[in-house]
């Protein structure tokens, strides 16, 4: 290589401001572990309020089992939110996937196909969302997925006549309600399914090119585009995965209740969004971690559990979850301001 | 024309219309290897649009583009990149939420196979990014800083590093110094001089004549979407260039074979 023209260029062209580095490190710590602290706080609160019940293995397993379907919805929603998008249709997709399996079950379709059906239905709905968003040049995913929220719910009622269907086969119920004994401990199958899904999502987001491109699109779609990233194709993949996870979620819920019911998942998209936001992801895209989403789901699950154990009215639970969402995001904003001005 | 050294870029009669707006009306541009060409012009003269045509972001409505003497048609920035033409955008095309190394290698990440999976080789990417920053003598505390935590000049350096990371023959820069503090401007301009010594051609758009006179070999002016004047830096005064920007010129400054009416 030719010698460069200007030795003094070697200067501090990219040089972190010394004093801000400590606060950056502190922020990085909060970014990574802030929600986990919140989980610990929730745990401590629950323990203080209900010492004998909360830590019983039965109760813990219950929390996990009850939040498993929300965890999968939130995971899919997270992928979408990282791209600065939103998927309002996940609750309806869950119901459509669940009812499709239930209807086929009544028709006597064998269980392996029943188990694959929710995945296929969910992925199909997600693909339509992604293709509609990109090919029809929808101004915002809000609109495409709001439409899909209605379409999928309508279809759910159409195929089922709007009535619940029970009597799903034992194999399906095992997924939602069964246990596996690992090392002498009974672990709900649904919990294992959730953990495997989260681990795969982590691997995908952190260690594949498509995963990194998803973050890049959320950070600056223009930068992604001029870097040769196929933004539209990536978005279609993201919405399809979100649909797939919503379908999986529907399967777990069907298994847990042993039935399909057409009102399943109404409003669940909002719980999923709440979990993602509580978990530290940015609504503006490009920020957040799989671990954070997991913690966000746990916080919601533990909060519900605590309020249930303490016999707090369901309506108050709703109020409290709302307060927590606002408080957490407000705290996050304050923290960033403090870090930026120091 | 034909006898001279091969031109890296030769754009002939490029026109670009956006609906009813005509941004470019038959613009010519040439660039020799390792040459630094300054492009000036008033707001809305069409400078950015011309550069976006050269870098594949816009497709021209008409006109011809030759790279190393070969006619090309760029469908996207990716096509232009494959020909060694890179652009540093006016509105910096960096993802602030990603690390420095990720930005430098965005869209061109190295991967390795693990079983049936192809995973991003983060270590290799970090090493590549560091090596390239060293080559440009851009010193970083850590390539794992997020780009949004950097100052304007630091980001500009990352953007330039990104543009030159893979065999760039030409780097197009749209007002790279517009948002920078004085000290940082100097560093970015020196970086451009560095690129020249590496044989990389540069097209520099700037409203700051200081920048143009500090680094450029030649300057050309656009006026209302057309060629207006051009000259080697040694043969032109600042005041004349200011005149060009405002649409005034002496007859002898007219570019050869263009706009002499
Ligand atoms: N995408 C677009 N759609 C419609 N009109 C456009 C578009 N891009 C540029 N134009 C128009 O084309 C003309 C040239 O714009 P351009 O951005 O190339 O000017 P410029 O010389 O870069 O100006 P500046 O110095 O302000 O950056 C302007 O009238 C502008 O409004
Ligand atoms: Mg411009």
Over which residues does each language-model region extend?
Chain B
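Glycine-rich phosphate-binding loops of nucleotide-dependent enzymes
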Residues: 2-261
């Amino acid at each position: 290589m030719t010698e460069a023209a200007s030795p003094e260029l070697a200067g501090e062209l990219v040089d972190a401001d010394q004093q801000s580095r400590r606060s950056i490190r502190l922020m990085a710590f909060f970014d990574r572990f802030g929600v986990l602290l919140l989980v610990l706080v929730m745990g401590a609160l629950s323990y203080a309020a209900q010492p004998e019940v909360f830590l019983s293995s039965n109760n813990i397993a219950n929390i996990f089992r009850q939040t498993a379907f929300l965890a999968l919805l939130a995971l899919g929603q997270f992928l979408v939110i990282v791209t600065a998008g939103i998927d309002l249709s996940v609750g309806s997709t869950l119901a459509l996937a669940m009812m499709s399996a239930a209807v086929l079950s009544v028709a006597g379709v064998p269980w392996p196909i029943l188990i694959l059906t929710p995945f296929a239905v969910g992925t199909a709905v997600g693909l339509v969302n992604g293709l509609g968003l990109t090919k029809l040049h929808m101004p915002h995913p809000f609109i495409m997925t709001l439409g899909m929220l209605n379409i999928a719910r309508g279809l759910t009622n159409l195929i089922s006549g709007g009535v619940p269907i029970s009597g799903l086969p034992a194999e399906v119920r095992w997924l939602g309600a069964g246990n596996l004994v690992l090392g002498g401990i009974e672990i709900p199958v649904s919990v294992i399914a959730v953990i495997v899904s989260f681990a795969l999502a982590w691997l995908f987001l952190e260690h594949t090119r498509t995963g990194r491109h998803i973050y890049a699109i959320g950070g600056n779609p223009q930068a992604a585009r001029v870097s040769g990233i196929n933004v539209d194709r990536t978005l279609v993949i993201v919405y399809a995965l979100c649909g797939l996870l919503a379908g999986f979620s529907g399967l777990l819920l069907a298994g847990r209740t042993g039935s399909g019911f057409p009102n399943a998942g109404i409003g669940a998209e909002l719980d999923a969004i709440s979990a993602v936001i509580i978990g530290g992801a940015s609504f503006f895209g490009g920020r957040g971690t799989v671990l954070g989403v997991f913690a966000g789901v746990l916080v919601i699950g533990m909060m519900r559990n605590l309020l249930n154990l303490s016999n707090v009215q369901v309506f108050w639970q709703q109020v409290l979850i709302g307060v927590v969402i606002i408080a957490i995001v407000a705290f996050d904003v304050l923290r960033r301001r403090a870090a930026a001005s120091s | 024309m034909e006898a001279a050294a091969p031109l890296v870029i030769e754009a002939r009669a490029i026109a670009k219309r956006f609906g009813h707006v005509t941004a470019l009306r038959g613009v010519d541009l040439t660039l020799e290897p390792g040459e630094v060409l300054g492009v000036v012009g008033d707001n809305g003269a069409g400078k950015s649009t011309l550069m976006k045509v050269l870098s594949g972001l816009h497709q021209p409505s008409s006109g011809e583009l030759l790279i190393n003497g070969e006619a090309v048609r760029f469908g996207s920035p990716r096509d232009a990149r494959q020909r060694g033409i890179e652009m540093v955008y006016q509105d910096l095309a960096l993802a602030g939420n990603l690390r420095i190394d990720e930005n430098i290698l965005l869209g061109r990440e190295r991967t390795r196979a693990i079983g049936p999976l192809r995973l991003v080789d983060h270590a290799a990417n970090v090493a590549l990014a560091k090596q390239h920053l060293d080559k440009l003598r851009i010193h970083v505390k850590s390539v794992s800083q997020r780009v949004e935590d950097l100052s304007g000049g630091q980001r500009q350096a990352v953007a330039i590093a990104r543009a030159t990371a893979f065999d760039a023959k030409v780097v197009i820069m749209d007002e790279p110094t517009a948002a920078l503090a004085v000290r940082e401007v100097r560093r970015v301009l020196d970086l451009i001089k560095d690129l020249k010594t590496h044989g990389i051609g540069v097209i520099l758009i700037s409203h700051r004549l200081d920048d143009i006179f500090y680094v450029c070999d030649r300057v050309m002016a656009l006026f209302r979407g057309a060629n207006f004047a051009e000259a080697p830096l040694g043969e032109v005064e600042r005041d004349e260039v200011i005149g060009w920007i405002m649409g005034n010129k002496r007859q002898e400054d007219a570019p050869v074979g263009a706009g002499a009416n």
